Regions:
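Nudix hydrolase/Nudix homology domain
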Residues: 84-86, 94
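N-terminal nucleotide/polyanion-binding subdomain common to many enzyme families
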Residues: 81
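Short S/T/G/P-rich N-terminal loop/turn motif that feeds into the first structured element of a domain
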Residues: 1-54, 63-73, 89, 96-107
Length: 107
């Protein structure tokens, strides 16, 4: 069963332009390098007024839990995680199944 994996990222300081570019480059490489996801999006809040310090959001979808677990173990994801740790990032993750109880509006 398909699922969504959503992660919010809070950094203790504003990222430099180079760091933002690094983050985007890493995540942009995943569809080809990792390949397991069916959707991948990365963005920032429009105003920052309500995000409580979580300045970036990663949205991914996977066909099943096994694919998500394989993604988590992939070296490209581990490198990204290490990059986050080096910057003392506080992630907030949420995973849920996409089923008749959670999909309230079909695409």
């Amino acid at each position: 069963m398909a699922l969504q994996h959503i992660v919010l990222f809070s950094f203790p300081r504003e990222l430099s332009d180079d760091e933002v570019a690094q983050m985007w480059e890493m995540v942009e490489s995943w569809p080809k390098e990792i390949g397991l996801m069916t959707r991948c999006r990365l963005g920032t809040d429009l105003t920052g007024a309500r995000n409580r310090g979580y300045g970036y959001l990663l949205y991914t979808e996977f066909p099943d839990i096994d694919a998500m677990n394989e993604y988590r173990a992939h070296p490209a994801h581990i490198r990204f995680n290490d990059w986050l740790v080096e910057r003392d990032c506080t992630p907030l993750a949420f995973d849920y199944l996409l089923d008749e109880h959670t999909v309230l509006m079909a695409e």
